[in-house]
Amino acid sequence: MKALKKVSNILCVLGLCTLMGGTSYAWDGKKDGTGTHSLIAEHGLSMLNNDLSGNESQQVKDNIKILNEYLGDLKLGSTYPDYDPNAYDLYQDHFYDPDTGNNFTIDNSWYASYPIYDTSRNSVRKFATLAKNEWEKGNFKEATFLLGQGLHYLGDLNTPYHASNVTAVDSPGHVKYETFVEERKDNYALNTSGNDTTSGVYKEAMENPSFNKWMTQNSIKYAKIAKDLYYSHSTMSHSWDDWDYSGREAIKNSQVCTAGFLYRFMNEVSNGNTGDNDSLTNEFNIVLKTADNKYAGTDDNVYFGFETNEGKKFEWKLDNAGNDFERNQVDNYILKTKDGEEVDINNISNYWIRKERLTSISDDWELSNFKLIANGKVIQQQDVNKVFTGNETYYINK
């Protein structure tokens, strides 16, 4: 029952929030777009500006100019995930161990609530893909805000404690270390990577023709560096000098990683990069927004599915820990095919969203819009603006 699930989850969250202090304590970020996350985003862009080769295409230069004009939105986006009212209560998706591929809800034995499969690695890809989609429509302000959110999770990947799945429950060092770094962040700020955009991190950012695969590869690379830094210089048994070295390296890596990421993103939106030609996938990511009306939310079950040209059907129940489909809420779901079966996204004939009545009394649901992501691209999107009543299926033809 959803009600039982919610009660169990609330009890677990209340207990864990007491232990964790009610926050994830990653790199610090303030709601007004200041703090460590903001510094990383701003200096990552500053690096790109200063390192930009004169041989870059005019399209890249023009788009970087636009990005600079929306720096404030980039900084606001870079701190927003810590204040998002729709966020997981324990910020579970801000963690990612590159060796297990999981966040702490799966890896840490003390976590007794429902597992969360979102990680900072997945979140980087999701927000960058959504940002690219909006940028290509000319919605630069919204795109930059979404890109900033992606950079937030990229920063989390570079945080030693987050890349090791060591929470404030596991060690008091989590809060102490990140507070230590926050107090010294300005000492760690950089304005160049040491290379221009023809070499170094920028050259590496362009080596994989697939944006989606590169994002995954890049996240794993930097998370491994951060995890190694945790065990070598960042635990409670290490000295203040060790922590200073760790903080300096971690913030440097965050800024350099951000500069490379922004460079790749600018090339993607400038050159119409079509490197992601792989149409096979076993994983989808759907993002749905419930309307901002008084009775728009629902406790009924919601499903998403599609059918291939051969008539094979796939369907998933959309059910995260906590409350799904609340008024004005954006919900995100990672959908994996059974046994890792690969689906050709070019071979999908139609999609559907289905509401199933949970009790004898229907709990209507008003869906505003949705976006479906696969292989680093938004492959389906629609402003639905529809009220679902009773047991109802809404078909979306490709």
Swiss-Prot record:
Which amino acids does the record list as binding Ca(2+) 3? T298, D299, N323, D324
Q: Where does Zn(2+) 1 bind?
A: W27, H37, D156
Cofactor(s) it depends on: Ca(2+); Zn(2+)
Q: Which InterPro entries match?
A: PLAT/LH2_dom, PLAT/LH2_dom_sf, PLipase_C/P1_nuclease_dom_sf, PLPC/GPLD1, Zn_PLipaseC
Q: What is its EC number?
A: 3.1.4.3
Q: Name one GO molecular function term.
A: zinc ion binding
One example of a Gene Ontology biological process annotation: killing of cells of another organism
Q: What is its main location?
A: secreted
**Which Pfam family is an annotated match for this chain, by its short name?**
Zn_dep_PLPC
Which region is the signal sequence?
A: 1-26
Which parts of the sequence bind Zn(2+) 2? Answer: H162, H174, E178
Residue intervals of the PLAT domain: 282-398
Q: Does the keyword Calcium apply?
A: yes
Ranges for the region named Linker are: 273-281
The cofactor note reads: Binds 3 Ca(2+) ions per subunit.
Q: What's said on domains?
A: The protein is composed of 2 domains; the N-terminal domain contains the phospholipase C active site (PLC), in a cleft which is also occupied by the 3 zinc ions. The C-terminal domain is a putative phospholipid-recognition domain, which shows structural homology with phospholipid-binding C2-like domains from a range of eukaryotic proteins. The ability to bind membrane phospholipids in a Ca(2+) dependent manner is conferred by this C-terminal domain.
Instruction: State any further remark.
Output: A hybrid protein between the N-terminus of C.bifermentans and the C-terminus of C.perfringens has an activity intermediate between the two.
Q: Tell me its family.
A: Belongs to the bacterial zinc-metallophospholipase C family.
Q: What is this protein called?
A: Phospholipase C
Please give the organism: Paraclostridium bifermentans (Clostridium bifermentans)
